Amino acid sequence: MLLSNVHIWNYRLLLDTNIHLDEALTLIVGKNNAGKTSFLSILQRVLSGRKDLDFADYPIQCRSTLYEVLWKVVKGKISIDKAKDLIPKTAIQFDIDYSNEAEDEYLGALSPFIIDLDINNNIARILVEYQSLLSDTIISEITDKISLLKVTNPTAKSKKSSEIIAISNYLSTNFNKIFEISVKAINPSNPSVFQIREVSHLRDVFIFKRISAERGLDELDNHDKKPIGQVMERIFQDGVIPFEENITKKIEKLKAYVEQESIKAQDEINKLLEEIITKMIRFGYPTAEDLQLKATTQILLKDNIIKDTDLAYSISGENETLPSSHNGLGYKNLIKIVFLLQEFAQEIKKNSLSAIPLLFLEEPEAHMHPQLQTVFVKYISEVLEGFTGNKIQILISTHSSYIANSVPFTQIRYFKRLKECVICKNLTDFYNTCQNDEEKQNNLQFLHKYMTISRCDLYFCDKVILVEGAAERLLIPDMIHKCDQAGLFNTKSPTLASQYCSIIEVGGAYAHKFFDFIDFLGIPALILTDIDFVTLHGKNCLKDKAKRTSNATIMKWCRDKLNIPLSTSVKIEDVYKLISDDKLTNGFRHIEFQKEENGYHARSLEEAIMNVNRDLYSISHSDSTFSFDSENQKKTNFSLQLLTDDDYLDYQTPSYIVDGLIWLNNQDKVVYPVTITVKEKNKRKLTLKTIKD
């Protein structure tokens, strides 16, 4: 059985957030403060059985309603029972799929939550709510708080507003009196049918383990706290219990044999450590070239327990050791995670009747080099299954593009923060929409391969710029800086120069393959591409001889915005029409290509720069036939000269790039969906709605 879905209401920014979980690994990605840690926090709170709710976790968006309802109760306008119905509740709902279990198989701790007698239903639904505990006593305390405020602040301009402030002050210190946890078994076929369950029933269903981002790896010399050693102690206590019992029987003779028994204990512990390390080698560490891991321990006679276990490091074939503080933080991080996984595996074995083991690993990439990050996420499920012998559901949150692009789309959940809430986008939905369209299916395959190879950071940016090649990738950051210094971004704060902008080098032949994905993620995107004039037969040419463009992205844009069918070729006049009819923007996307300046229409970035900086390149102002010789001049050298040569540092930026960067700078946060125009056979109309920063 598995946890298939989690729905959260009114917890921090998770106002109405649905998260579908993969049966093996779910990767949670998104920018900072996008709700990833909040998701973990409510899982940990509820599954650990915490009965109260913190005021800081109650959404700001719900507080005004709560204050208003309590004020009406105080004033006698509504009853306490009515108020309980009106107060927004924090809640989380779990859907557990047990369809893979045999009909006669014992469902263990899940049994109390299966209340639907329909044999065709294989979902158990658990609803956990923080119910209102509003009572006469609480209302009396709030009334006293209001009366006290009248004494201390008699000049308040508005009587009601001052009373609302008093209610807010009361709640900030007494919030644990207002809500208490309630657990229900819900009938999925008829949600109005439910049965009350105990919190202990919920705790029995899950074995939940959190490995937080703040794992504490620093080990100062001569410092008492040894974080990895502490985990090892807990593991080895279980691993050598039979040995400890043997010591207990010989307690009277223990002093005489203590040295001998310590050696045996050391052997037992190193056997267990060797088993763990054997599984850890899957992550590429330690190899024969690395310092080898050993465990050191002491037996304290007064406690009769194993104490002060820690790691030591040795060179292969040598007896000399070094302390654990001599290892790097990246490998320490990996080692500690693996030991915590082993500890979790032991918990699972102790609680075999629990239905679902659930591991939440927060930002495992800390201190790891990129290659180790990739290997880690590739093998974690296999390693953990090796520890337990069972499949474990794993949730990983990350800010690493190496980890994010190492798993298939179907395992990724994208947390996107809007102005007042967080939404979770299930990339399985994007994957599924591509399956019935051959072109989209090909684009999907390209996307995954490209993002894996390039370690694209689309999931973690505010905005994205798709560019032609290396020259644009090198120059765009400098051009953004120039526009910012010129005051062209002053309509926004922070400006584009301070926003998290990803630059993806993809080229005009492939940029259009990103369109559907960008639309799905809802990221403002600027496409900077080349107009690529060609004759009717596809030969490169100047504007006066151009009949069409060879740029696949521009052709796709024309078909979508001008509704040109695939059976009709895109003419160069159609490309010009995009500019004249203001059709360069489509939903979240905006495209820019070269425009005519100084009586010349450039065909590439290099030509556009040369055109607006003619004096730098000794080009006559009347010359309308010059071109960039890509055969004799390397594009990267052209760009580096602009960035490093003192004579070129004050170059001017072409207008099409300036216009595009200003558009991108001015984009606000948006609520998905927006109106996106596509060619007629796939045309869809959606409601445009924006949220201002």
Enumerate the predicted regions with their spans:
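Conserved nucleotide-binding/hydrolysis micro-motifs of P-loop NTPases
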Residues: 45, 98-101, 131-136, 215-218, ...
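Short glycine-/polar-rich loops that comprise or flank the Walker A/P-loop
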Residues: 88-90, 121-126, 204-208, 355-356, ...
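Short alpha-helical segments and helix-capping/turn motifs at coil-helix boundaries
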Residues: 73-80, 109-114, 184-201, 278, ...
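Extended helical coiled-coil dimerization/tether regions that scaffold
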Residues: 205, 209, 213, 217-361
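Glycine-rich phosphate-binding loops of NTPases
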Residues: 57-248, 542-582
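Flexible phosphate/Mg2+-sensing switch loops adjacent to catalytic phosphate-binding sites
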Residues: 48-81, 345-354, 386-395, 420-426, ...
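Switch/communication elements of ASCE P-loop NTPase nucleotide-binding domains
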Residues: 1-48, 312-454, 658-693
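Acidic, Mg2+-coordinating catalytic modules of nucleic-acid enzymes
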Residues: 200, 447-466, 470-693
